[in-house]
C-alpha cells in the first residue's frame, strides 16, 4: 500500500483584499509555470500543481462575525486557507516569500484568534 500523504495547512491573512488571480499573477511574473496554475474565479480558489496540489482558498465563507472583528483588530481584511502536502513545504515557503514581499500579511493558525502566528520558516 502507498503511504498516506500528510497534509499541512495555515491561514494567510492579508491587510487588503486580493483575488486568487492576483496571487497567481505574482507567481507567474516570477517565472512559475502558468500550466501549473488553475484559478476558479467564481469561488476565488487557486490550485498550484507541483508534485502534489497546493490549494489556496478564500476563507471568507467560513468567517464568523467574531472572526471578522479579530481580523479588523489585526489590520487584516482577507483570509486564505492554504493546504498542501508536507513534502511541498520548501515550494510553499518560496511561494509565501513572493506573496509576503508583494502583499505583506501574516501567517496564522485556524484558531479563534488566528494564533499562534507563524514565520515562513515554520511552514
What name fits each language-model region?
Residues 1-9, 14, 18-35, 83, ...:
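Acidic, proline/glycine-rich low-complexity IDRs
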Residues 16-87:
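Short, intrinsically disordered low-complexity segments
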Amino acid at each position: 500500500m502507498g503511504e498516506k500523504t500528510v497534509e499541512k495547512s495555515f491561514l494567510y491573512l492579508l491587510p487588503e483584499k486580493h483575488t486568487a488571480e492576483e496571487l497567481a499573477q505574482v507567481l507567474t511574473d516570477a517565472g512559475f509555470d502558468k500550466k501549473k496554475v488553475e484559478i476558479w474565479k467564481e469561488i476565488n480558489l487557486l490550485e498550484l500543481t507541483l508534485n502534489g496540489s497546493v490549494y489556496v482558498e478564500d476563507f471568507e465563507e467560513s468567517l464568523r462575525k467574531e472572526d471578522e472583528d479579530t481580523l479588523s483588530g489585526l489590520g487584516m481584511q482577507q483570509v486564505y486557507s492554504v493546504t498542501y502536502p508536507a513534502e511541498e513545504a520548501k515550494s510553499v515557503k518560496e511561494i509565501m516569500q513572493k506573496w509576503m514581499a508583494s502583499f505583506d500579511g501574516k501567517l496564522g493558525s485556524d484558531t479563534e484568534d488566528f494564533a499562534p502566528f507563524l514565520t515562513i520558516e515554520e511552514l
